[in-house]
Amino acid sequence: MAAKLDSQLLGLVFQSRPDILKGIQEAADSPARIDLFNNIASFVYERIADNTSEEPATKRRRVEAQTSGPNGAAHPIAGSQAAVLGADAAAAEPVLLEIKDISVSVPQRKKYDLCFTKNFLYARASGSPVPVQGIVYPWKDIEHAFYLPVPDKSQVQHNYVLLPRNSYLPTTKSQQSADQQTQQQTSAPLEPLVFTIPSTAPKPGTITGPSAAAAAPVSDSYATLFHWALTTSLHAAGNHACELVSSDPKVFHSVARQAYRPQEKAVHVKAFRGSKDGFLFFLPTGILWGFKKPLLFLPLDKIVAISYTSVLQRTFNIVVELEGGGEGSEEGGQEIEFSMLDQEDYAGIDQSYVRRHGLADRSMAEQRKAKKQLAENAKKAAANGEEGEGGEGGEAGDGLTELERAQKEEEQRLQDEEDEEEEDYDPGSEGESEGSGSSSEEEEEEEDGEGEGDEDDDEDMGEGLEGEE
């Protein structure tokens, strides 16, 4: 069997020096040289791993935090072995679809080629054969995906936001310490991925790979192309829980006119989180704050209540209370505050979004969680091919699906609770006036008793008179 260059290992070792990599490929013209280059790459790779583990902790943290990538671009690296293994696994799979020259803003701000494989989405520098470490996403780990307009731009642009597991909720100090201990045993959580597309169609030669022919009918615009590619890849990898959600003016839109596109309804509001400015998007599935790091997404089922503070003539603040750490957790819920919202949007946020979703009332939080659990159970049942009572699709004799029946049962339970509260209602607890009413009833009963006694006396007197006659 002819010797072959270990392109994967060489790519990892010489990722920042594509010129050396190219020279090796040109010089590898004999089996002896191929073995030599492979041995050199293996030796260098082992030395890098050994040096990383033997460095003092303070120096290692500094180096692992940031390093120089291709073309001098700084990015978080593979000091972590898990990141290297993730990149290796992605690089080992054949690229099904590649879309070139896409502007990525999170976790790094740079143009990359986005590659779609069976199990991964990753970015790689133009001309490089290996993924950029830290921008490798298993399809199964992506929990939320959004398609949102980019604010404050004269040209129409949109951001795709992909949120992997454990990447979008704020963490408390106790959670951070627990996460650090977990990360020592497992891989560190991925950062969100945000990339921007224009409203134009892709240029010729931008789309390559075996699936390029299948993508041709949906390549009239970047939006239709990525919608198809993301949805198809998620479903093919077995991730049916994640759906691509777009902003909807019917769900929420700002009344403030946009400076750059005044004829277009803005589906965002400007807001600060601490000293950082950003944009709040009120979406069908939750509230997203972007597009600066760290991004936040607050799902509806995690929100306990929303309240308002510092309501002034021109601005107000919004406070989102999140549920605690779950069952058995002693830690209370978090409160996330966004400040300096425009007063013009107060009514729209409160009426069109907060009250419509029952977010102003803490008592609705359990119902939202119950509905989510019911929906997840229904999806699991459908995925496992389970059938409900009465036949296919989880339908029983009432013609309802499992989810509809569960929601109906939940509504009935709430109604029963209200009925029980009405039955337990004690009129005597409302004040002295109710007590006096009870006294008057007793007096009436006494009077009735006296009246009956008088009638008896009259009868006795009548009998006595008859006897005398």
Curated annotation (Swiss-Prot):
It comes from the Eukaryota. One of its GO terms (molecular function) is DNA binding. Signal peptide: none annotated. Keywords: Chaperone, Chromosome, DNA-binding, Nucleus, Transcription, Transcription regulation. Residues 54-73, 364-469 are annotated as: Disordered. GO terms for cellular component: chromosome; nucleus. It is found in: Nucleus; Chromosome. Residues 364-379, 402-415 have a biased composition (Basic and acidic residues). InterPro entries: PH-like_dom_sf (IPR011993), RTT106/SPT16-like_middle_dom (IPR013719), RTT106/SSRP1_HistChap/FACT (IPR050454). Residues 416-433, 440-469 have a biased composition (Acidic residues). Histones H3 and H4 chaperone involved in the nucleosome formation and heterochromatin silencing. Required for the deposition of H3K56ac-carrying H3-H4 complex onto newly-replicated DNA. Plays a role in the transcriptional regulation of the cell-cycle dependent histone genes by creating a repressive structure at the core histone gene promoter. PANTHER family: FACT COMPLEX SUBUNIT SSRP1, HISTONE CHAPERONE RTT106. Belongs to the RTT106 family. Interacts with histones H3 and H4. This is Histone chaperone rtt-106. It comes from Neurospora crassa (strain ATCC 24698 / 74-OR23-1A / CBS 708.71 / DSM 1257 / FGSC 987). The gene is rtt-106.
